[in-house]
Amino acid sequence: MALVVKGKVNINEFIDLTKMEKILPSMFTPVKSVMCSKVDKIMVHENESLSEVNLLKGVKLIDSGYVCLAGLVVTGEWNLPDNCRGGVSVCLVDKRMERADEATLGSYYTAAAKKRFQFKVVPNYAITTQDAMKNVWQVLVNIRNVKMSAGFCPLSLEFVSVCIVYRNNIKLGLREKITNVRDGGPMELTEEVVDEFMEDVPMSIRLAKFRSRTGKKSDVRKGKNSSSVRSVPNKNYRNVKDFGGMSFKKNNLIDDDSEATVAESDSF
């Protein structure tokens, strides 16, 4: 199976297959189809927002099957002048889960002075095709101490995922094939790590409060179509701590108009 898509996200960073599994026909291996999604964007206009994100954009799903979200690459761009103060916390959410601590899949913090940032998450769990079609993932964004007039966009986020689609769970054993991201920097951070360095309020608690204020699903907005006015920035400012050690590779990015890529697609 050809698992590296040139000029795209490196699938091998998320899925660890043996040499035999890479060359065997699909009938002899449990992994049937590995895909990279199209890029989905969120334009952040508010200091705190919960937006839907399509992590399976352009991915061909199997009727009555499953899809495993093996990996996720998030790229952010601050639309600000250099050396601005403040920062942002970004949290990936599974909106199906009622308990906020179980709904948060991973969170990350970065300073506004870092103009472009990129981090990776390995969710490593599967959902049914029926659930996937309901767009179950959201992104909770909390911007702090960025002084920008209302109505403008201080931050843009782009998402691309690596996923595996399959028809049956029997003999899949995919969890044994998932590896951790091998970069030395803090590309994948659990909420505990982020809270230790930066957060006064954990993102799971922030999510619970946000849901209680707005209603869990009724007020969630599409990221790209959001035209709401940004709320007034929080005046309680704390010094931003920079994690450092970020690794940014240009060849890991996917162009805006790129198509979803099938690394290997065989009969199911």
UniProtKB/Swiss-Prot annotation:
Pfam families: MP. Residues 225-237 have a biased composition (Polar residues). It comes from the Viruses. One of its GO terms (molecular function) is double-stranded DNA binding. GO terms for biological process: transport of virus in host, cell to cell. Signal peptide: none annotated. Keywords: Host cell junction, Host cytoplasm, Host cytoskeleton, Host-virus interaction, RNA-binding, Transport, Viral movement protein. Transmembrane segments: none annotated. Transports viral genome to neighboring plant cells directly through plasmosdesmata, without any budding. The movement protein allows efficient cell to cell propagation, by bypassing the host cell wall barrier. Forms a ribonucleoprotein complex with viral RNA. Binds microtubules and modulates microtubule stability. Can bind double-stranded DNA. Triggers host hypersensitive defense reaction in incompatible plants harboring resistance (R) proteins. Belongs to the tobamovirus movement protein family. Binds to host RBCS at the plasmodesmata; this interaction seems required for viral systemic movement. In resistant plants, interacts with host MBP2C at host microtubules; this interaction prevents virus cell to cell movement. In resistant plants, interacts with host resistance (R) protein (e.g. tomato ToMV resistance protein TM-2(2), AC Q71BG9) at the host plasma membrane; this interaction triggers host defense responses leading to programmed cell death. This is Movement protein. It comes from Tobacco mosaic virus (strain Korean NC 82) (TMV).
